[in-house]
Amino acid sequence: MLQLIAIGEILFDQIDGKSILGGAPLNLALTAHQLLQRFGGSCIPVSRVGNDDLGNTVLQELNSRNVCADYIQVDPDRPTGTAVVTRTEMDHSFTITEHVAWGFLAESQAAIDLEGEASAICFGTLGQRSSASH
């Protein structure tokens, strides 16, 4: 069975008064899972969200799409990640909120075991900027 793992940030883009679920690893996980499940495969996200409304929204969205949420840690102290998107006529920029849950993804034996079963692993770049997640 083909199994992919997407490790890294889960966040909400705050744009024009709306919150849009994203983060490159999660976007990959959702799209790849939809494609792979047709062939008996899956893509599993590994990340960390806050114990807050946005974190609950992430878990509900994964559940509604039949994506495994077993490797999503819930941080009791830090919020779910956000990125404020500022748009202009010609461009847009992102302000990534710091000290959020995904930046403190903790090592777990379950995730290590999962990685041993994976056909491929994708790492998000934002999640690699914190030494806590290395």
Predicted features and spans:
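A general structural signal for well-ordered alpha-helical segments in protein cores
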Residues: 4, 25-29, 55
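Short catalytic helix/loop segments, enriched in acidic residues and glycine
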Residues: 19-36
